């Protein structure tokens, strides 16, 4: 499964100034299964309430580019220590429709054991889907939306959709 990730760029698109960054945390569990960490945002959040998302957010002073933002946010939201993170590269920046933010997805392998500590304020739930399931085109569905297909994935009774679904599909070569 790690071989499927070889297409990841080593740098973000030149000239793009990201307004946000997310960490796409990937790890191998103790059974040798490759998984991803996703979170569900609480319904009380002012933006993206109830959405399934990667840890991430807007830059703050002192962040060292998109990687610094993604690492800080992942630590704040789910307790991933920066020392556990091996950045593999970047996906193309994603322009979110709802807030027109340019988001840089930072893809990283996370060292285990993974001892997550979700922020009660920012995380309602943590998911650990297997990459092999997310990479299965048969498990995805779509609805026509404007000029595009809005892809979605059933994730333990919740729906992975929108920009996060687009990032997952880009990562796994499904787009």
Each language-model region and where it sits:
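N-terminal leader/linker segments that precede catalytic domains of diphosphate-processing enzymes
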Residues: 1-54, 58-113, 123, 143, ...
């Amino acid at each position: 499964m790690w071989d499927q990730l070889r297409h990841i760029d080593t740098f973000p698109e030149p000239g793009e100034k990201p307004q946000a960054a997310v960490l796409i945390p990937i790890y191998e569990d103790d059974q040798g299964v490759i998984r991803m960490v996703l979170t569900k945002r609480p319904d009380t959040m002012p933006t993206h309430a109830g959405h399934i998302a990667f840890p991430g957010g807007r830059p703050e002073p002192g962040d060292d580019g998109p990687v610094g933002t993604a690492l800080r946010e992942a630590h704040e939201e789910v307790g991933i220590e920066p020392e556990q993170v091996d950045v593999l590269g970047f996906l193309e920046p994603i322009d979110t429709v709802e807030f027109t933010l340019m988001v840089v997805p930072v893809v990283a392998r996370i060292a285990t054991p993974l001892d997550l500590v979700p922020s009660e304020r920012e995380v309602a739930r943590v998911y650990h889907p297997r990459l092999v399931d997310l990479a299965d085109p048969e498990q995805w569905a779509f609805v026509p939306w404007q000029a595009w297909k809005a892809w979605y994935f059933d994730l333990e009774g919740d729906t992975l959709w929108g920009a996060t679904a687009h990032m997952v599909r880009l990562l796994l070569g499904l787009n």
